[in-house]
């Protein structure tokens, strides 16, 4: 079973695929993952759901109406507010050129359909762990910066290192 690294809330996974049977299969694969799931049915819907749902990870199909997965990925990775969302492209496209386009767009991972359940779950586990560790590292970095600036909980200025 894949468990989210963060204890404060369940991980959020957005499935972005316009094919209902594919969505159902991915949802079935995720039944043992402790997560909240949302579904987007096209590229524009994906961008809207990202804003509202704030996913930790997106399972992103490439060939969707209104905007391709490549374009969605590129937009998300170029935006400071969404660049840290993990993106796993799940697609029937599996030529070397397709993988290169996915990497150029900024994807964090790539799986070809038909998807192997264990392979997908391992990718998700690693990506969620990385996302949560990165979030915790950023939280600690901000805390240290506040302490150094004297704006932390003690509020008495920067500390001199002990000798």
Predicted regions and their residues:
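C-terminal output helix
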Residues: 115-128
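Acidic, metal-coordinating helix/loop segments flanking the phosphotransfer/catalytic sites
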Residues: 39-57
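Receiver (REC) domain active-site loop signature in two-component systems and cognate sites
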Residues: 64, 87
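Non-catalytic signal-transmission and effector/linker regions of two-component phosphorelay proteins
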Residues: 1-14, 27, 131, 135, ...
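Two-component/phosphorelay signaling modules centered on CheY-like receiver
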Residues: 20-41
């Amino acid at each position: 079973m894949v468990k989210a690294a963060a204890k404060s809330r369940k991980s959020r996974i957005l499935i972005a695929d316009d094919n209902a049977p594919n969505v159902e299969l991915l949802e079935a694969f995720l039944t043992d993952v402790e997560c909240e799931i949302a579904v987007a049915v096209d590229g524009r819907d994906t961008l809207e759901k990202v804003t509202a749902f704030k996913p930790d990870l997106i399972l992103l199909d490439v060939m969707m109406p209104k905007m391709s997965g490549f374009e969605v990925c590129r937009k998300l990775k170029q935006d400071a507010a969404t660049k840290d969302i993990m993106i796993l492209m799940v697609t029937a496209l599996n030529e070397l050129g397709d993988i290169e386009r996915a990497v150029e767009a900024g994807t964090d991972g790539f799986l070809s359909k038909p998807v192997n359940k264990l392979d997908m779950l391992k990718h998700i586990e690693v990506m969620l762990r990385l996302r949560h560790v990165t979030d915790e590292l950023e939280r600690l970095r901000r805390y240290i910066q506040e302490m150094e600036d004297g704006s932390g909980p003690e509020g008495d200025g920067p500390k001199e290192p002990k000798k």
